[in-house]
């Protein structure tokens, strides 16, 4: 037996009289895709079978993309290069070619890696360098992760529109695909590539090439034996049904078959009562017979079985591969938390040095960095403001070689993109190094560009001693900045040393700052001060304010070093402070390469605005993405009750005894990506590591053994167990690596989620890349048990 069953003894439920007949009819698995044969008229273009399954072969925009277009790639005012762009027949990728005499180079980008397709001059690059091309002829392809935007100009407006519409349709179709459809599409793509002479037949050499492409290092003798067993025509070529049979054997999931047969018995189909028993053993909330019947109607592929409320092995697999069968609780993927509590009661997704796309020494600044941050659910962005020419403030990392962008352009990007993913409020964290005149210009730009989005006065509230809620501030923009004291001179200069507010105390990290700039930063424009309604940037002087003088609008900014010191020395007091008002934590200025710190320690103490360098991928950003994966990815996650109570006794350094046992049996993986596509014989040796990130006493990591030369369907069957003291704060990170005995392991994929959103039972983990992009159809298959004391 593959793994221990945690089921009760049962009596086989009565089945409908037709069950045996239906079982016999549906026992044969649903057909897998295979290259078209001459009978279906597809020999000349076998790859189009994939687009046909997407229902797009007759779409005029897609057909135009298949023919290809000569588009101009725009990088600067003088760099406009023509490229041939053509959609590949798999519908998954776009091929483009440079026009270099004698040595044309070819490149590919994948549709699933596209974040957005914009028409017109809707990117920083086209606004700056696309003036020679009419907006109607221009488009921008924005990618996920760190890849730069692709700014293009078409020969005509109609051709540009075809690419905008075509890519939009392809993205929508890919997003709507079930896991089974993704797998079918993935197979089509590799079959098309492995069929070197495009004759819709597969020689043994082509089969070996296919196996290497999909990350399988199969023994030649075994591969040839399998090949010959499927070669019923005995002509050393597989075609049609023979290829289908080979793929079915390759894709066989014995571990799923075993689980299925535990519940279906000899009938080879699940009745609705049997499926209900499986759901109950899984620990599914709301498991009823009606729910089991609904799942059959949703995921069963065979119409005969569906009519008789029966589920075949294929339908069972489709259910387990669906979002409802995933480890992440599907009900947590929409906004499900109370959004009517004060802002201080939420973790808020926050970015540091948002304007940078690379390091903070010489990297470029870009408004596109803000667009990307908002696309990742960020709700608090940083604007590092300095004196600019012509009376216009600029944003860059001061006293470095980073490039500069206009403050007003960033505000416009906020207006256009801040609420495309989430309706909840955005906080603009101003690091202000400007004089009074340009501060007034900043205030003017904020008011005129943002208009009614900008919060300029306090809302009517039944409890003025608390911050407003995310629900009350939907669609609004808050400014975090210095606030003038009540008594001041008209020019904004009457600030005593005692009353002077600290902005981000980043000035202490920047010893190179000129004295003149420091003097400018101490002056506060009345116009800009008036906009800091709910987020007054203030030096943290005490964790014990007077009980009769609550100041919920004060926001303290701390370096990671100062925050860690407070956590160690005054853990519970810091927790209570963060239950009342906002705290922002930012990386040390010494992180010149824009590296990140682990945000978990700050979340443990209730810090809301834990700012990270979004431009730098790594486990720290994986944790951030995992924390904000739930609640509709809206950028706000309600803190646990122990971090919201003003009289909380919780201390992250002393969380108490273990309260939860987490057991995860790592069973198998499927279709892991190939790390080095340029080396056909390079196959991964995968291992799985599970990490717990929480309070210090809960942090742990364990890993499986590695499996030699199999990234296609490796098997482990190993159980990893963890004891947790504060499960409500814990994140679980699943990591797959390629084992290397002589050097650090290579990253393959990961997925991170809160323990509170982890479902029990047999589940799939859908892996993500370093940049957070889907690696579909790559998955882990695991069994999860959570025991709470």
From Swiss-Prot:
Annotated ranges, domain C2: 644-769
Record's bilayer topology term: Peripheral membrane protein
Induction text: Down-regulated by Ca(2+) and cAMP.
Record's keyword terms, sorted: Calcium, Cytoplasm, Hydrolase, Lipid degradation, Lipid metabolism, Membrane, Metal-binding, Phosphoprotein, Repeat, Transducer
Binding annotation for Ca(2+) 1: 195, 197, 199, 201, 206
PI-PLC X-box domain boundaries: 337-482
Residue stretches of biased makeup (Basic and acidic residues): 488-497
An example Gene Ontology molecular-function term: metal ion binding
Substrate binding, as annotated region: 73-101
Activity regulation summary: Strongly activated by phosphatidic acid. Inhibited by phosphatidylethanolamine (PtdEtn), phosphatidylcholine (PtdCho), sphingomyelin and phosphatidylserine (PtdSer).
Residue sites binding Ca(2+) 2 per the record: 231, 233, 235, 237, 242
Tissue spec: Present in corneal epithelial cells (at protein level).
Cofactor binding comment, as recorded: Binds 5 Ca(2+) ions per subunit. Two of the Ca(2+) ions are bound to the C2 domain.
Stated name of the protein: 1-phosphatidylinositol 4,5-bisphosphate phosphodiesterase delta-3
Gene that encodes the chain: PLCD3
């Amino acid at each position: 037996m593959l793994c221990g069953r945690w089921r009760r003894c049962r009596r086989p439920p009565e089945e409908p009289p037709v069950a045996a007949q239906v079982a016999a009819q549906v026992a044969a698995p649903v057909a897998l895709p295979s290259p078209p044969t001459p009978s279906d008229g597809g020999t000349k273009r076998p790859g189009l079978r994939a687009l046909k399954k997407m229902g797009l072969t007759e779409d005029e925009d897609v057909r135009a993309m298949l023919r290809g277009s000569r588009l101009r790639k725009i990088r600067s005012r003088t760099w406009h290069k023509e490229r041939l762009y053509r959609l590949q027949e798999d519908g998954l990728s776009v091929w483009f070619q440079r026009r270099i005499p004698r040595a044309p180079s070819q490149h590919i980008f994948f549709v699933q890696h596209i974040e957005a397709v914009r028409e017109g001059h809707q990117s920083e690059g086209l606004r700056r360098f696309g003036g020679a091309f009419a907006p109607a002829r221009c488009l921008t392809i924005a990618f996920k992760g760190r890849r730069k935007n692709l700014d293009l100009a078409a020969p005509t407006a109609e051709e540009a529109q075809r690419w905008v519409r075509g890519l939009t349709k392809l993205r929508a179709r890919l997003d709507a695909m079930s896991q089974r459809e993704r797998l079918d599409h993935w197979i089509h793509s590799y079959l098309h590539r492995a069929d070197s002479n495009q004759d819709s037949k597969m020689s043994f050499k082509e089969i070996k090439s296919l196996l290497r492409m999909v990350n399988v290092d199969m023994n030649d003798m075994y591969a040839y034996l399998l090949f010959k067993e499927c070669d019923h025509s005995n002509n050393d070529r597989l075609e049609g049904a023979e290829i289908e049979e080979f793929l079915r054997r390759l894709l066989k999931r014995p571990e799923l078959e075993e689980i299925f047969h535990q519940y279906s018995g000899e009938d080879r189909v699940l009745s609705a009562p049997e499926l209900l028993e499986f759901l109950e053993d899984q620990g599914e909330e709301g498991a009823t017979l009606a729910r089991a019947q609904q799942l059959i109607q949703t995921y069963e592929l065979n119409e005969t079985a569906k009519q008789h409320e029966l589920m075949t092995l294929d339908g069972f697999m489709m259910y387990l591969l669906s979002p409802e069968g995933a480890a992440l609780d599907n009900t947590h993927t929409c906004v499900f938390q109370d959004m009517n509590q004060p802002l201080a009661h939420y973790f808020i997704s926050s970015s540091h040095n948002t304007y940078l796309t690379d390091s903070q020494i010489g990297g470029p600044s870009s408004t596109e960095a803000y667009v990307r941050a908002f696309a990742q659910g960020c709700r608090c962005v940083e604007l590092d403001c300095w004196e600019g020419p012509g009376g216009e403030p600029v944003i860059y990392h001061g006293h470095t070689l980073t490039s500069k962008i206009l403050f007003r352009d960033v505000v416009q990007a906020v207006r256009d993109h801040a609420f495309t993913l989430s309706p909840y409020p955005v906080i603009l964290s101003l690091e202000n190094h400007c004089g009074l005149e340009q501060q007034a210009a900043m205030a003017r730009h904020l008011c005129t560009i943002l208009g009614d989005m900008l919060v300029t006065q306090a809302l009517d509230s039944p409890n003025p001693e608390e911050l407003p809620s995310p629900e009350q501030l939907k669609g609004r923009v808050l400014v975090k900045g210095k606030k003038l004291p009540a008594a001041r001179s008209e020019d904004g200069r009457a600030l005593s040393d005692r009353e002077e507010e600290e902005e981000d105390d980043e000035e202490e990290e920047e010893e190179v700052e000129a004295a003149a700039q420091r003097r400018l930063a101490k002056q506060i424009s009345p116009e800009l001060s008036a906009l800091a309604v709910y987020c007054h940037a203030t030096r943290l002087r005490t964790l014990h304010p007077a009980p009769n003088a609550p100041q919920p609008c004060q926001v303290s900014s701390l370096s990671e070093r100062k925050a860690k010191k407070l956590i160690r020395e005054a853990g519970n007091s810091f927790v209570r402070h963060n239950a009342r008002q906002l705290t922002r934590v930012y990386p040390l200025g010494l992180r010149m390469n824009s590296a990140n710190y682990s945000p978990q320690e700050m979340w443990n103490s209730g810090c809301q605005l834990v700012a990270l360098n979004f431009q730098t991928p790594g486990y720290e950003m994986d944790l951030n993405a995992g924390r904000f994966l739930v609640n509709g990815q809206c950028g706000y996650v309600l803190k646990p009750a122990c971090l919201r109570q003003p009289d909380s006794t919780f201390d992250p350094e002393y969380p108490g005894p273990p309260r939860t046992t987490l057991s995860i049996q790592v069973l198998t993986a499927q279709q892991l990506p190939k790390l080095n596509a340029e080396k056909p014989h390079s196959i991964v040796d995968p291992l799985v590591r599970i990490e717990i990130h929480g309070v210090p006493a809960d942090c742990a990591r364990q890993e499986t053994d590695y499996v030699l030369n199999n990234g296609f369907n490796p098997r482990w069957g190993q159980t990893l167990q963890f004891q947790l003291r504060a499960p409500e704060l814990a994140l679980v990170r699943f990591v797959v690596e390629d084992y290397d005995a002589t050097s650090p392991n290579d990253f393959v994929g990961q997925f991170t989620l809160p323990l509170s959103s982890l479902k029990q039972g047999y589940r799939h983990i859908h892996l993500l890349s370093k940049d957070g992009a889907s690696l579909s159809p790559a998955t882990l298959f695991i069994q999860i048990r959570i025991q709470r004391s």
